[in-house]
Structures are given as structure tokens and as C-alpha cells.
Amino acid sequence: FVHFSFMDRTMTTVSIAFVNSLFRVATVAVLFPFIRFLEKMVCAIFKEVVDEEDKDIVEISVLDDRFIAHPTVAIEQAKTVLCSMAHMAQKNLIRSMELLDTFSQEKYDKIQRREDKVDRYEDKLGTYLVKITQQELTSGQNKEVSKLLHTISDFERISDHAVNISQAAAELFNEKLRFSDCAVEDVIMKEIVGNVIDAFEQNKVEYAYKTEPLEELVDIYCDEMKMNHVKRVQKGECTLHQGFIFNDLLTDFERIADHCSNVAVAIIELELNVFDTHEYLINLKKDNGTNFDKYFEEYKEMFPLSQY
């Protein structure tokens, strides 16, 4: 034990502060050369899983109840989180489609984790938006909150169907089966989901108008692919079990397109102050200034079934 002369003295506040500062400076001086080593040691002990999913965790924290008294801020925060949720659903879909081509257990597990996160976002957003509706809102704010409330479940359901696709991919992998027929649906699914997210995120009604023609094309192609697959089963080229899996996949594709259509219709209806969805869809397909036929033919040429 080292004895210093000042230890026999009565310590004042000044001397305590001085010794404390001296100790800290000495500690830094001694440990400074070992900073890199200490950093590596801490990282080795507390391993951090670096994943892009972690970026999303921060975003849900912006739904602070203190903002609810200020609807403009609260609505903007809610939209930010919902856009983040939509992108998570989109990434889940992209990953699940990739699994149909090349299965990866790591990617499969990531899809399941992301789906859990999407569910948490949906619950938190729904509760938060209901609280916002209890405030005095302007007409514009009411419209924006309505759009968010209308679209939450559709984005969540897109992620649900992505999980279904991943599970079908796992089943195909385990049974050493593979489908080549899904190539066209792969590109169309990415197109329709990306299109509707852009429409929602950027408030682009013109993007929303392109969604319904794409949804129509998805339905037509799925029907054709089902018929073609039935013929292969009848010829003995595919098993009945393969047929069930394939039909389930096509159903998921159709449902995803339906949910994209729901989001697009919500955007357009709220923009035009039209709230009869059935009547709107009828008028849309009559091409009353919406360029439905034009977009449909463009997409049909862009994604020809015979090329896949």
C-alpha cells in the first residue's frame, strides 16, 4: 500500500475535486494505448447481430403519446412508421420469392422474424391512430388518418402472404421439388407492391391508377397458370401434391395483388372524395379518364406470360 503525504490532511471540496480529476486523467493516460484492444474485447463478449432489421426498431419509438396533442406531428410520425412497415412487408415478399428459386434457412428465419415485427407495428400503429382520432382534427388531417387506418391491415396481410410463400418454398425444398412457372409472378409481384408503396409514400395518385390494371393482369395470369398446371397433373407430369402447393402459391399471389389494389383504391378515393369502392372499381374499368386499358396493355407487353 502506497502512502501519500496528502492522505493525512483533511480533504476539502477543492482537493477532492482535484484528486478525482487527477485520477481520471491518469486512468485515461494508462488505458489510451489499449483502446482498440478493449473495444475488440467488449465486442467479443457482447456480440451484436448486425442486421438491417435493427434500423426499424428505432422508427417505432417515434410513436410517442406526447405528440398526440399535436396531430400534425403525430400523423407524420405515424405515416413514417407505416411506410417503414410497408417496406418490411415488401422485403419479406422479395425474400420469399427468392426462396422459391434458392432456399436458404437463414433467409427463411429472417422472414419469420420480420413478420413478427410487422405484427407489432400493426398493433402499435392501430392504437396510436385511434388516439389521434380523439383529437380535434382538420378535414385534411381526418383524410390522412383515414388513409392510414385503411391501409395498415393491407400492408400487414402482404407480409402474411409472404410468410405463406416462404413456407411453401420450405416444403418444396424439403421434398426436392421446384416450380419454374412462378417467374412471371415474381416480377409482377415486385412491380405491383413497389408501385403501390411508391403511391402511398409519395402521395402519387397517378401511381395508384397503375395498380388496378396490374391486379387484373395478376388474376388473368394466375387463372391461366392454374389451368396449365391442371393439364400437367392430368398428363402425369406433376403429382397431385405439387398441384396443391402450386395452387396455394397462386392464391397468395392473387391475395397480395388484392391488398395492393385496396391500398391504391384507398389513396384514390380519399384524394377524389369518393367513398363507394364498388362503384369506383366499375368506373375504373370503364376507363373513365384513368387510362386503365392503356396501362393494362403496357403491363401485358412488359410481362408476357409466354416469355417466362
Regions found by a protein language model. Give the residues of each.
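Cytosolic, long alpha-helical scaffolding segments
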Residues: 2-19, 23-308
